[in-house]
Amino acid sequence: MTPPALELTLPEELLLLALDPLRGKPYCAGRSLEYGTAGAVLRELEFQGRVTGQGGRIRVLNPHAPPDPLLAHVLESLSAPGTGWPAGDTDTRRWVRQTGRYVQELCLEHLVRRSVLRRETHRFLGLLPYHRHPAADPALSLAVRDRFTAAEAAGFPDPRGRTLAALVSAVGLSGAVARGGLRQRWAMYNLVTEEWTAEAVHRNVRQDRANRNRRMRYSSGGGGSGGD
C-alpha cells in the first residue's frame, strides 16, 4: 500500500535523503549533515518570505511565526529587523556552524514525533550512548528518493529542487543519491555557488576538511620545524 502523501519541509527532505532508512546512519559525515540541515531551514524560511540572504548575511523580512513549530523556533532565534547583529542581520556561515547540531536535533525530534523516523539508542563500546534514526516506514524515504531522482532527470527545473540538489552536493551526499553519474554530480556541485545557504554550508564543510588535514600533518610530524 502506498503511504499517504506527507508534507515535508526542505530540511526534512534532506534528512530523509541522507539517512539510511534501515540502519538510520547518515550516508555523509554527521557534522556536514548538521550544517546542511541548518542551511535547509534558512532556505525554507526564505521560500516562505521570512528571511533573505544578502552578502553572506541573514536578514529577517517577516518576524511573524510560521505555522510549522520548528521553523517558528528558528525564526525567533534570528535577529528581528533592526536588532541583533549590526544592520539587524546575522552572518550566515557562522550561524550555520554554531546552530547546526541544535537545529538538526530539533528536526529529528520533529520527525520522530510525526512517526516518520524512529529513534534507536546504541552504546559505543557499551558505554557512550548515541542515536540512530531509521525510517518508521521505509516506503516514505523511498518516495523522497524517487522524487529527487525525477527532479534530477528533469535538470532540477524548480527553485526548491535546485536548492535541495545544492545542499546534497554541499554536504557530500551526491555520490549516494545522484543517479546521473559524474556529469550530473558536477552539475549539482555548480549549483552550490548559486544558493546562498548551500554556499555557507559548503564553506563550513571545507573548513572542517582543512582542519582535519592540518591535524593529520601535525600528528605525523609535518607541522613542526627543526634545525640546528
Residues covered by each model-derived region:
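Short, Lys/Arg-rich nucleic-acid/phosphate-binding segment
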Residues: 55-58, 121-126
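Residue-level signal for secondary-structure boundary elements
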Residues: 22, 26, 82-86, 119, ...
